[in-house]
Amino acid sequence: MQYSEIMIRYGELSTKGKNRMRFINKLRNNISDVLSIYTQVKVTADRDRAHAYLNGADYTAVAESLKQVFGIQNFSPVYKVEKSVEVLKSSVQEIMRDIYKEGMTFKISSKRSDHNFELDSRELNQTLGGAVFEAIPNVQVQMKSPDINLQVEIREEAAYLSYETIRGAGGLPVGTSGKGMLMLSGGIDSPVAGYLALKRGVDIEAVHFASPPYTSPGALKKAQDLTRKLTKFGGNIQFIEVPFTEIQEEIKAKAPEAYLMTLTRRFMMRITDRIREVRNGLVIINGESLGQVASQTLESMKAINAVTNTPIIRPVVTMDKLEIIDIAQEIDTFDISIQPFEDCCTIFAPDRPKTNPKIKNAEQYEARMDVEGLVERAVAGIMITEITPQAEKDEVDDLIDNLL
């Protein structure tokens, strides 16, 4: 027998009340986008569940793609069969012969939305259970936590059988919580922060600061590759490259070394916030983890945050490095993150950065610079590229390959 569809059950959508259908429609669109590479697959959704009709597509590949979609609690591969007692009996026997191993227990769980069907749920459980005993005489029934729970659903158009439930990614459908700008450096932490924001339904755009010739084309490609890894969880992502060389040279020339990192981060925050305004984002997201480096003390965060009133989401702020690495390995970004390309935060990093910078001091040093002009020129020079989940190269890839 061949699977005909995948039955998809929702996660936290059950708590969304009057907005439930908006969340469901967004989830349906997200599922359709992720499964668009399987041209045969068709997706529908109603208030209770969604269905991915395989139409001959490879179930295993489709299931792997579904595991990445946020908003799905779990899903089950389903056999569609004729709605008759005899066909149901023979189908149940065929499935059980295929999956049963010595010593396993089972139960039949039937329900029907077609109340004109000749047997009610209790009678159907008994009839199909009897068919299983005919096929496998020594099998044992167990009503609580059996090894095999064979689920039978009688609908108007057909009968559906399933026995396996696969855990989904959970969370909320990407896009239901608004848009956020992810400050993507190229390290381990910021891609994990982006992943966790996606899981809570935030549609992210990646903002990456490049300082050529101090940062290499390889560093830019690394950030782009990390962005591509995140697309499998939320679809296409806009990659925004910000020219940052002029600003870093200005900071280096006009500020004391201890404040280089603080001022660099304040400029990054200003620029990201300006991009957010233009692109209708609601929040800024970054990979700061409390106390991990000098710019991530509470005093530093306060001094850096002072340049904006926009909410800053720090998904990994309370995690230690090993916890973050575990997630990075799970989402397949770790090996890219540890590639030996320096980002613009490390090239001018002072030997002894200030861990408790004062806002008034930062403002005093910035008064030596044309802050607004520097920010405006950086924002005017951004380059935006749409990063897709597919393996084919984007325009930025081609450009970088020519430079390397």
UniProtKB/Swiss-Prot annotation:
It catalyses: [ThiI sulfur-carrier protein]-S-sulfanyl-L-cysteine + a uridine in tRNA + 2 reduced [2Fe-2S]-[ferredoxin] + ATP + H(+) = [ThiI sulfur-carrier protein]-L-cysteine + a 4-thiouridine in tRNA + 2 oxidized [2Fe-2S]-[ferredoxin] + AMP + diphosphate; [ThiS sulfur-carrier protein]-C-terminal Gly-Gly-AMP + S-sulfanyl-L-cysteinyl-[cysteine desulfurase] + AH2 = [ThiS sulfur-carrier protein]-C-terminal-Gly-aminoethanethioate + L-cysteinyl-[cysteine desulfurase] + A + AMP + 2 H(+). It is an enzyme of class 2 (transferase). InterPro entries: Rossmann-like_a/b/a_fold, ThiI_AANH, ThiI_fer, ThiI_N, THUMP_dom, THUMP_ThiI, tRNA_STrfase, tRNA_sulfurtransferase_ThiI. It is found in: Cytoplasm. Its main location: cytoplasm. One of its GO terms (cellular component) is cytosol. GO terms for molecular function: ATP binding; CCA tRNA nucleotidyltransferase activity; tRNA binding; tRNA-uracil-4 sulfurtransferase activity. Keywords: ATP-binding, Cytoplasm, Nucleotide-binding, RNA-binding, Thiamine biosynthesis, Transferase, tRNA-binding. ATP binds at residues 183-184, 208-209, 265, 287, 296. Residues 60-165 form the THUMP domain. Pathway: Cofactor biosynthesis; thiamine diphosphate biosynthesis. Its EC number is 2.8.1.4. One of its GO terms (biological process) is thiazole biosynthetic process. The keyword ATP-binding applies. SMART domains: THUMP. NCBIfam families: tRNA uracil 4-sulfurtransferase ThiI. PANTHER family: TRNA SULFURTRANSFERASE (PTHR43209:SF1). Catalyzes the ATP-dependent transfer of a sulfur to tRNA to produce 4-thiouridine in position 8 of tRNAs, which functions as a near-UV photosensor. Also catalyzes the transfer of sulfur to the sulfur carrier protein ThiS, forming ThiS-thiocarboxylate. This is a step in the synthesis of thiazole, in the thiamine biosynthesis pathway. The sulfur is donated as persulfide by IscS. Belongs to the ThiI family. This is Probable tRNA sulfurtransferase.
